[in-house]
Design a protein with these regions (language model features):
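S-adenosyl-L-methionine-dependent methyltransferase catalytic module, highlighting the catalytic core
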Residues: 95-104, 108-110, 114-231
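Conserved SAM-binding loop
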Residues: 1-127, 228-232
């Protein structure tokens, strides 16, 4: 019931922002906030970050969301953000853009600031069992990620790459976090099925798709997401 109410409120907020009398927050509004925390994608009132963060999305405006494409540079100064979180968003963005995006997040984070990243884990049995594969056994489409597979390409907003810990490590190793930061790989599955499942400090940013909150892996706790905490030095 509460979730349904939140959806109605979010929808009303969008209409009132688009047609008046409310307005979308600006980057100047963000910089004037006491708490400068960003959340990639649409920020809904049903999640705890609605009280602490502003979302970044070009698709859905509201009083809690900045109208901006996260792959474009952020029009704010260096070292002006306390924390940046992305949960199940970056797999919808072309893999070739990841390192530059990580570096832009590093630029705007204040020293000691946190980049919390969570992505679907494609070594996880829960995620693998639903995927379509190509002739060499490679994952080509995840129907749960949205979009369509057309002529070998995922279109219309689906997962355009399929995160595994080996890929994510390489991305961070190529980013500024490797040379000017600390990277903690908190939860992930290895190719051989072994995994790391360290406790998550949810006070730093709630994550839904973990054994603590996701019923699919609650009976036999194991990673369903790759969770990384990267701190700027």
């Amino acid at each position: 019931m509460k979730e349904q109410i939140y959806r109605y409120v979010d929808a009303a907020d969008y209409i009132l922002c688009r047609y008046g009398p409310l307005s979308f927050p600006s980057w100047e509004d963000f910089l004037a906030r006491n708490s400068r925390k960003l959340y990639a994608g649409k920020l809904r009132r049903a999640i705890p970050q609605a009280a602490t963060h502003l979302g970044i999305t070009p698709f859905f405006g509201s009083t809690r969301n900045l109208h901006h494409d996260v792959t474009e540079p952020f029009p704010i100064p260096d070292c002006s953000v306390e924390a940046f979180q992305s949960e199940d968003v970056f797999e919808h963005i072309d893999l070739s853009k990841m390192v530059s995006l990580f570096n832009e997040i590093h630029r705007v984070l204040a020293p000691g600031g946190l980049f919390r990243l969570s992505l679907p884990d494609y070594h996880s049995d829960q995620n693998l069992q639903r995927c379509q594969r190509g002739p060499r056994g490679e994952i080509v489409f995840d129907p749960a990620g949205g979009g369509k597979l057309v002529d070998g390409r995922v279109i219309e907003g689906g997962h355009v790459w399929f995160p595994k810990i080996e890929i994510v490590r390489d991305l961070f190793n190529e980013s500024l976090f490797a040379t000017h930061g600390t990277i903690k790989y908190v939860q992930y599955t290895n190719a051989d099925g072994t995994f790391k499942l360290d406790p998550i400090d949810y006070s730093l940013g709630y994550i839904q798709r973990t054994p603590d909150h996701d019923a699919r892996v609650a009976d036999r706790p194991r990673p369903i997401s790759i969770v990384v905490d990267a701190f700027k030095s």
